[in-house]
Amino acid sequence: MKKETVLWAMLATTTCVTAQNGKIPTSGVSADSVLTEKDSIKADKEAEIQAVTVTGHRPMYKMRNDALVTRIRNTPLAKEPTLEDVLKHIPDMKQTADGSLEVNGLGAPTIYLNDKKATSAELSHLDVKLIDEIELITTPGAKYDATTGAVLRILTRRTEEGIFGKMQVYDKLSEVNTNHEELTLGWVTKKISLTGFYGYTDNRYNVHQPQEALVRAKDGEYLFGTDRHGKNKANYNATELNFDWLISKQHEVGIQWEGLWLNGGRSEKQQQYYRYPNPAGEDTNSEMKLSDADGEMKYFDAESQQWGHQRSHHINLFHLAKWSKHFSSQIYLDYARNKDSDSQPITEKEGSEMQETLNRSNSNYDIYSGRIEVKQLISDKHSINYGGEWSLMEGKGKTESSADMLGTTEYKNHDTKTAAYLQYQGGVGKWNWWVGIRYEHLTSRYTNLSEKSPDNMERHYDQWFPSFGITLKEPSWHHSLSFRTTTARPSFRQLSGNIYYTSRFQYQISNPKLQPVNTYRLTYSVQWKDFMGMLRYTRIDHSIMYVHEVPEDKPVRYVSTFMNFNKIQKYMAYLNWGHVFGCWRPNAHASITYQRFSVSDHGELISYNGATWDASFDNYFTLPNDYQLSLSYSFDNGGQVGKTKFHPTQNWSLGANKSWMDGRLQVAFSANDLFHQQLFKERTHEHAVDFSQTEDYKLWSYKLTVTWKFNKRKGRYNGMNSAEDELNRL
């Protein structure tokens, strides 16, 4: 008995539980932990222990079917102040050059909140403590839009009745200061939920972006460079109103309105330089350094101001019905209007010469969409899901420039999309599976209203998107194999046919002839105890990338545009491990992706084969009295991505938070990129141009967040935003 008592005491010590006078503090005890409690443990007098509680923690990450599930409730992630802070700690999520988050190799995920597509306002004021778990689905089923690469499903707790509210403010300091304030108020009864939200953000950041292009033209080599320093400012005013009415146990309806007012500006100073080929008969030194130019390098200064305004409104209606025990339906209707405009005066000075350019643009879009989903239960383990959606987007815009070769372009866009899907889900014993098919028809019409050079185009796409998944769950193992096809349609900016002024030596040209990108992915996932792994094969057809060219018929030395490329193949492997050692929760993650891709560029075969790998190590420390600390490190070797080769980056970050008054008041501090090592250096080699640049968005920051809750309830709104995909394209 003595040995057993000592063992229990050691376990209690390693789990950071303190036993004092036979009583154990219960703050922070997980309701979802595996709890073993002995009311009385009789030990020898020498042990002097009257009672011990031993808590075994469930893992923070696990596999469910073909999804990676991150538990939030009663884990250290529940104490993160915002959803963005939580998403940084989900395995396979990466931070991009501008600070946004994406899924490794799959781009930005589509986010669902309780099975409805979430809006940006909803996510900005979501209370992290009300989240149960987050599913990362890298092979979504047929019900999801074909443009969706990955899905994040956020599942929250059920609502409680009463009046609730939350105020949150944060201040983020880097080279400049960003602040945010928000207020959420609501009232919930058994039948009705009414919620209102207002948020204001004053977002500021500086950018340093040096770039250089070595251009190989028929008459020799040109060198163009820019050292760009930008100061950015944007003011966001976001509002949201939700009304949800549970008419009966079988029917629920609701309406949501969102509004966004954005005013922003960018002030930029540049020092540009250039070097023309040596005159005939002189040697051209392609390795010439700037300091060795001996007067052959020319310099000039440029300044620009860019001011933008955006106004958008979005209305969502929904009806949820349960017609019988085995049959249910969901209907969503949306209307959105988006209006934006911007102006950009540019001044370039070289000696006593000065050149001024004014660029302006505006656009207006209306979006109408609807979606219906039906679920038919065949038995406990077998069901059929089917449905359809329709959307219409109409818009017009205008771009104008005082530059001689640009002039004015007026255009119209008209897009209609019709889609239908069917998916079957079933299971027997340890096996579960699903198989689905999705059909999408898209008509895209672009009309150039310019009388001088009309460039009108109408395209029709009819595509089928099959998908399937199968899982095997055993006591210690979990296996999953899944397949999905997706598409990525060009953005309106890429298709518009417009020409954008960058500098006197460079223009950016859109390409109305771009084709959609088609992607095919086969994924195998496995979990064994604390380890999770993944193998993925990806084939990409008609990939869209930047290219730099030297036109012969225009008075400019090089232009950048978009172009479709042939097949890219990627092979990805990923491993994650996490465990709980008392108050310490470490989690380690590593992945590697090898790319096979080559291009025939004006008769030159260029290989872009190469690998990229990354690793991260997160640590959470749960301390007494509701204190929590975190320390994270990540490394990314950059590697080859498409045609671009990136340099390595790394990031050290830490956080600390403390709660009072049963969690109603929370103060959180975080520091990101402590040693300023997130500089994204990239280089691209093409037949005509070697291009390199550094993107320094000053991602290092210190952030203080204060949250006060009137109580812990939340509003209920079960509508789905069926227009979110089209809004994102804008």
Model-derived regions: residue spans:
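N-terminal periplasmic accessory domains that precede
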Residues: L35, D39, A51, L83-V86, ...
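Short, acidic, small-residue-rich periplasmic hinge/interaction motif at the N-terminus
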Residues: N21-P76, T96-D98, I137-T139
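Periplasmic plug
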Residues: M63, K94-T139
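Outer-membrane beta-barrel translocator/receptor signature
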Residues: I131, Y144-L152, E160-P210, A234-N237
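Face-selective signature of the C-terminal outer-membrane beta-barrel domain
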Residues: A238-N263, E303-L449, K473-H478, F531-M534, ...
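Outer-membrane beta-barrel signature, preferentially recognizing the C-terminal barrel domain
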Residues: K412-D415, N456-Y461, T487-D541, V559-Y571, ...
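Surface-exposed extracellular loop regions of Gram-negative outer-membrane beta-barrel proteins
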Residues: L155-M167, H208, Y236-T239, S267-Q271, ...
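Outer membrane beta-barrel strand-and-loop segments of large Gram-negative receptors
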Residues: I367-R371, K417-A419, I509-N511, Q515, ...
